[in-house]
């Protein structure tokens, strides 16, 4: 993970432990192109070769936020299974309600599948910086909508979170 994102993640994990006594753990962070290819190809096999179906769950190599060093799949220490049920755990609920305080967003929320293109992933957080995370949380919109609407059609670098000057 990038250093700024990794520091924020450590702060988030410490706050969760302090506030509700739950230990969060990193499950999957930075991925190389090769690792993402393996993950994608494995999903492709599990869904019978349908790229359309695989694309709902796993980013194609070269298109994964994990390759940016800004995303982390998180779990609770008691289980590292990446399933929708994580969202119903104390840790999952805490992440959903509090990750923005540390500059993260819950990237693939329930009900946003048609906008994000991915199924609900309560374990997948994406670092966007504290200012952007607070604005996204307040607006209750996915990153795609924020990048277009909240900044008034201004181009925003999704890696740095800074406005791109013309």
Regions flagged by a language model, labelled:
Residues 1-166:
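Cell-envelope/glycan interface and biosynthesis
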């Amino acid at each position: 993970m990038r250093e700024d994102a990794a520091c924020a993640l450590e702060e988030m994990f410490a706050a969760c432990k302090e506030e509700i006594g739950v230990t969060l753990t990193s499950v999957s962070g930075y991925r190389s192109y090769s690792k993402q290819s393996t993950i994608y190809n494995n999903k492709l096999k599990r869904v019978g070769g349908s790229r359309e179906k695989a694309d709902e769950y796993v980013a194609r190599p070269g298109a994964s936020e994990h390759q940016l060093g800004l995303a982390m799949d998180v779990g609770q220490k008691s289980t590292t299974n990446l399933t929708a049920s994580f969202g119903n755990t104390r840790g999952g609920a805490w992440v959903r309600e509090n990750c923005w305080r540390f500059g993260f967003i819950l990237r693939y929320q329930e009900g946003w599948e048609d906008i994000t293109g991915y199924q609900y992933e309560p374990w997948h957080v994406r670092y966007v910086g504290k200012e952007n995370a607070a604005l996204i949380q307040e607006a209750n919109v996915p990153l795609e909508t924020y990048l277009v609407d909240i900044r008034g059609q201004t181009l925003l670098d999704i890696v740095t979170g800074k406005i791109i000057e013309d």
